[in-house]
Amino acid sequence: DLILGAGVSSKFFLACRPPGHHAFPSMGSGFCIFNNAALGAKYAREKFGIKRIAIVDFDAHHGNGTQEIFYGDSNVFYMSFHQHPHYPGTGGPDETGCGKGEGFNLNLPFMPGTEEPDYMVSLIDIILPLLERFEPGLIIVSAGYDSHLSDSMSSLGLVEGSYWKIMLALSIFCRWACNGRMGIVLEGGYDCGSTADSAVNTISACLEDSTIMKIKNIDDMENYFKVDNDYRKNRVRNRLMLDELRKNFNLN
Protein backbone atom coordinates (compact mmCIF):
# COMPACT_ATOMS: atom_id res chain seq x y z
CA ASP A 1 0.00 0.00 0.00
CA LEU A 2 2.81 2.44 0.87
CA ILE A 3 4.53 1.87 -2.49
CA LEU A 4 1.64 1.39 -4.88
CA GLY A 5 -1.19 3.22 -3.16
CA ALA A 6 -0.13 6.11 -0.96
CA GLY A 7 3.14 6.62 -2.83
CA VAL A 8 4.92 7.27 0.48
CA SER A 9 8.03 5.44 -0.70
CA SER A 10 9.23 3.59 -3.79
CA LYS A 11 10.86 0.86 -1.68
CA PHE A 12 10.30 -0.96 1.59
CA PHE A 13 12.21 -3.48 3.71
CA LEU A 14 10.04 -5.91 5.67
CA ALA A 15 12.02 -7.28 8.63
CA CYS A 16 9.76 -10.26 9.21
CA ARG A 17 10.07 -13.52 11.10
CA PRO A 18 9.47 -16.30 10.30
CA PRO A 19 10.72 -16.26 6.69
CA GLY A 20 8.37 -17.35 3.93
CA HIS A 21 9.78 -18.71 0.69
CA HIS A 22 9.44 -22.40 1.63
CA ALA A 23 5.72 -22.01 2.45
CA PHE A 24 3.12 -23.51 0.10
CA PRO A 25 -0.53 -22.48 -0.33
CA SER A 26 -1.77 -25.25 1.97
CA MET A 27 1.15 -25.83 4.34
CA GLY A 28 4.32 -24.40 5.78
CA SER A 29 7.79 -25.91 5.59
CA GLY A 30 11.43 -25.08 6.23
CA PHE A 31 10.80 -22.62 9.12
CA CYS A 32 8.18 -20.83 6.95
CA ILE A 33 4.45 -20.50 7.64
CA PHE A 34 3.17 -17.83 5.23
CA ASN A 35 4.88 -17.01 1.95
CA ASN A 36 5.42 -13.28 2.39
CA ALA A 37 6.81 -12.61 -1.10
CA ALA A 38 4.04 -14.55 -2.83
CA LEU A 39 1.34 -12.86 -0.76
CA GLY A 40 2.83 -9.47 -1.62
CA ALA A 41 2.87 -10.29 -5.32
CA LYS A 42 -0.73 -11.51 -5.34
CA TYR A 43 -1.87 -8.47 -3.33
CA ALA A 44 -0.15 -6.08 -5.75
CA ARG A 45 -1.82 -7.77 -8.70
CA GLU A 46 -5.31 -7.96 -7.21
CA LYS A 47 -5.51 -4.57 -5.48
CA PHE A 48 -3.36 -2.40 -7.75
CA GLY A 49 -3.52 -4.22 -11.07
CA ILE A 50 0.23 -4.70 -11.47
CA LYS A 51 0.39 -7.00 -14.48
CA ARG A 52 3.93 -8.36 -14.25
CA ILE A 53 5.96 -8.90 -11.10
CA ALA A 54 9.47 -10.30 -10.69
CA ILE A 55 10.61 -12.04 -7.51
CA VAL A 56 14.40 -12.19 -7.05
CA ASP A 57 15.51 -14.56 -4.28
CA PHE A 58 19.11 -14.64 -3.00
CA ASP A 59 18.57 -16.82 0.06
CA ALA A 60 21.03 -19.72 0.29
CA HIS A 61 18.14 -22.18 -0.03
CA HIS A 62 15.88 -22.56 -3.04
CA GLY A 63 12.44 -20.99 -2.52
CA ASN A 64 10.49 -24.11 -3.40
CA GLY A 65 7.22 -22.65 -2.12
CA THR A 66 7.47 -19.48 -4.19
CA GLN A 67 8.47 -21.46 -7.26
CA GLU A 68 5.52 -23.84 -6.94
CA ILE A 69 2.99 -21.05 -6.43
CA PHE A 70 3.95 -19.27 -9.67
CA TYR A 71 5.34 -22.16 -11.75
CA GLY A 72 2.55 -21.98 -14.33
CA ASP A 73 2.17 -18.18 -14.26
CA SER A 74 3.63 -16.07 -17.07
CA ASN A 75 3.02 -12.82 -15.17
CA VAL A 76 5.32 -13.59 -12.24
CA PHE A 77 8.97 -14.30 -13.03
CA TYR A 78 10.68 -16.11 -10.14
CA MET A 79 14.49 -15.96 -10.10
CA SER A 80 16.54 -17.73 -7.45
CA PHE A 81 20.25 -17.83 -6.55
CA HIS A 82 20.90 -20.71 -4.13
CA GLN A 83 23.38 -23.36 -3.07
CA HIS A 84 22.94 -26.75 -4.70
CA PRO A 85 22.83 -29.49 -3.60
CA HIS A 86 21.20 -28.22 -0.42
CA TYR A 87 17.82 -28.14 1.32
CA PRO A 88 15.10 -28.47 0.00
CA GLY A 89 16.64 -30.31 -2.97
CA THR A 90 14.74 -28.41 -5.67
CA GLY A 91 15.87 -25.56 -7.90
CA GLY A 92 17.72 -27.22 -10.75
CA PRO A 93 18.50 -25.20 -13.89
CA ASP A 94 16.03 -27.31 -15.88
CA GLU A 95 13.09 -26.11 -13.74
CA THR A 96 11.94 -23.28 -15.99
CA GLY A 97 8.16 -23.24 -15.52
CA CYS A 98 5.25 -25.15 -17.02
CA GLY A 99 2.35 -24.38 -19.35
CA LYS A 100 1.92 -20.63 -19.71
CA GLY A 101 4.68 -20.17 -17.15
CA GLU A 102 7.33 -21.93 -19.21
CA GLY A 103 10.36 -19.66 -19.43
CA PHE A 104 9.34 -17.55 -16.43
CA ASN A 105 11.23 -19.48 -13.74
CA LEU A 106 15.00 -19.13 -13.44
CA ASN A 107 17.21 -21.11 -11.08
CA LEU A 108 20.89 -20.37 -10.52
CA PRO A 109 22.11 -23.39 -8.49
CA PHE A 110 25.57 -22.51 -7.18
CA MET A 111 28.11 -25.04 -5.95
CA PRO A 112 29.33 -24.76 -2.33
CA GLY A 113 32.04 -22.14 -1.98
CA THR A 114 30.53 -19.77 -4.53
CA GLU A 115 31.40 -16.13 -3.84
CA GLU A 116 30.43 -12.67 -5.03
CA PRO A 117 31.75 -12.83 -8.64
CA ASP A 118 29.20 -15.47 -9.68
CA TYR A 119 26.37 -13.35 -8.31
CA MET A 120 27.51 -10.21 -10.11
CA VAL A 121 28.06 -11.97 -13.45
CA SER A 122 24.67 -13.68 -13.08
CA LEU A 123 23.01 -10.33 -12.46
CA ILE A 124 24.62 -8.49 -15.35
CA ASP A 125 24.60 -11.29 -17.93
CA ILE A 126 21.36 -13.13 -17.11
CA ILE A 127 19.00 -11.62 -14.56
CA LEU A 128 18.99 -7.99 -15.70
CA PRO A 129 18.63 -8.84 -19.41
CA LEU A 130 15.73 -11.16 -18.56
CA LEU A 131 14.14 -8.45 -16.41
CA GLU A 132 14.50 -5.97 -19.28
CA ARG A 133 12.72 -8.43 -21.54
CA PHE A 134 10.00 -9.14 -18.95
CA GLU A 135 9.26 -5.46 -18.10
CA PRO A 136 7.97 -5.90 -14.52
CA GLY A 137 5.87 -3.25 -12.83
CA LEU A 138 7.21 -4.26 -9.41
CA ILE A 139 10.17 -6.24 -8.10
CA ILE A 140 10.00 -8.18 -4.85
CA VAL A 141 13.30 -9.32 -3.35
CA SER A 142 13.47 -12.35 -1.06
CA ALA A 143 16.52 -11.25 0.92
CA GLY A 144 18.12 -14.22 2.66
CA TYR A 145 21.42 -13.59 4.41
CA ASP A 146 22.26 -17.24 5.12
CA SER A 147 24.42 -17.05 1.98
CA HIS A 148 26.88 -15.03 4.09
CA LEU A 149 30.32 -16.50 4.71
CA SER A 150 29.72 -16.43 8.49
CA ASP A 151 26.36 -18.23 8.40
CA SER A 152 26.53 -21.93 9.26
CA MET A 153 23.35 -22.71 7.28
CA SER A 154 25.21 -22.72 3.94
CA SER A 155 28.66 -23.00 2.40
CA LEU A 156 28.40 -19.87 0.25
CA GLY A 157 30.81 -16.98 0.55
CA LEU A 158 29.05 -13.63 0.35
CA VAL A 159 30.00 -10.76 2.66
CA GLU A 160 28.10 -7.65 3.73
CA GLY A 161 29.31 -5.63 0.77
CA SER A 162 28.10 -8.30 -1.64
CA TYR A 163 24.51 -7.58 -0.67
CA TRP A 164 25.15 -3.86 -1.17
CA LYS A 165 26.27 -4.55 -4.75
CA ILE A 166 23.38 -6.92 -5.52
CA MET A 167 20.82 -4.48 -4.17
CA LEU A 168 22.40 -1.48 -5.88
CA ALA A 169 22.16 -3.30 -9.22
CA LEU A 170 18.51 -4.16 -8.59
CA SER A 171 17.73 -0.62 -7.41
CA ILE A 172 19.25 0.81 -10.58
CA PHE A 173 17.16 -1.52 -12.71
CA CYS A 174 14.01 -0.60 -10.76
CA ARG A 175 14.53 3.05 -11.63
CA TRP A 176 14.67 2.15 -15.33
CA ALA A 177 11.79 -0.30 -15.40
CA CYS A 178 9.20 0.24 -12.68
CA ASN A 179 9.50 3.76 -11.28
CA GLY A 180 11.84 2.52 -8.57
CA ARG A 181 9.20 0.28 -7.01
CA MET A 182 10.73 -2.57 -5.04
CA GLY A 183 9.67 -4.52 -1.96
CA ILE A 184 12.28 -6.40 0.07
CA VAL A 185 11.25 -9.17 2.48
CA LEU A 186 13.60 -10.83 4.94
CA GLU A 187 14.09 -14.56 4.41
CA GLY A 188 16.86 -16.59 6.06
CA GLY A 189 19.84 -15.41 8.06
CA TYR A 190 20.88 -17.22 11.23
CA ASP A 191 24.09 -15.49 12.27
CA CYS A 192 22.73 -12.43 14.05
CA GLY A 193 25.71 -10.17 13.46
CA SER A 194 26.16 -10.80 9.75
CA THR A 195 22.41 -10.74 9.14
CA ALA A 196 22.07 -7.34 10.80
CA ASP A 197 25.06 -5.88 8.95
CA SER A 198 23.90 -7.33 5.63
CA ALA A 199 20.42 -5.87 6.10
CA VAL A 200 21.97 -2.46 6.76
CA ASN A 201 23.98 -2.80 3.53
CA THR A 202 20.81 -3.76 1.66
CA ILE A 203 18.97 -0.67 2.86
CA SER A 204 22.01 1.55 2.27
CA ALA A 205 22.22 0.44 -1.38
CA CYS A 206 18.59 1.39 -1.93
CA LEU A 207 19.40 4.93 -0.75
CA GLU A 208 22.36 5.50 -3.12
CA ASP A 209 20.39 7.99 -5.20
CA SER A 210 23.35 9.66 -6.91
CA THR A 211 24.76 6.35 -8.16
CA ILE A 212 21.33 5.02 -9.08
CA MET A 213 20.64 8.11 -11.19
CA LYS A 214 24.08 8.07 -12.85
CA ILE A 215 23.97 4.57 -14.37
CA LYS A 216 21.87 4.52 -17.54
CA ASN A 217 22.12 0.96 -18.89
CA ILE A 218 23.60 -2.49 -18.34
CA ASP A 219 26.87 -1.51 -20.06
CA ASP A 220 27.30 1.35 -17.57
CA MET A 221 26.58 -1.08 -14.74
CA GLU A 222 29.12 -3.56 -16.08
CA ASN A 223 31.76 -0.82 -16.04
CA TYR A 224 30.75 0.45 -12.60
CA PHE A 225 31.08 -3.00 -11.02
CA LYS A 226 34.20 -3.80 -13.11
CA VAL A 227 32.72 -6.99 -14.55
CA ASP A 228 34.88 -7.49 -17.64
CA ASN A 229 35.83 -10.59 -19.66
CA ASP A 230 38.85 -11.29 -17.46
CA TYR A 231 36.59 -11.17 -14.38
CA ARG A 232 34.15 -13.59 -16.05
CA LYS A 233 36.91 -15.98 -17.12
CA ASN A 234 39.04 -16.12 -13.98
CA ARG A 235 36.77 -15.46 -11.00
CA VAL A 236 33.54 -17.34 -11.73
CA ARG A 237 33.15 -20.89 -10.35
CA ASN A 238 29.86 -21.81 -12.04
CA ARG A 239 30.78 -20.68 -15.55
CA LEU A 240 29.52 -23.78 -17.41
CA MET A 241 26.13 -23.63 -15.70
CA LEU A 242 25.78 -19.91 -16.43
CA ASP A 243 26.74 -20.45 -20.08
CA GLU A 244 24.04 -23.12 -20.37
CA LEU A 245 21.43 -20.83 -18.82
CA ARG A 246 22.32 -18.04 -21.28
CA LYS A 247 21.75 -20.52 -24.10
CA ASN A 248 18.49 -21.89 -22.68
CA PHE A 249 17.03 -18.40 -22.16
CA ASN A 250 18.26 -17.12 -25.55
CA LEU A 251 20.70 -14.61 -24.10
CA ASN A 252 23.73 -15.48 -26.25
Where are these regions (language model features)?
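A general "terminal functional-core" signal
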Residues: 1-252
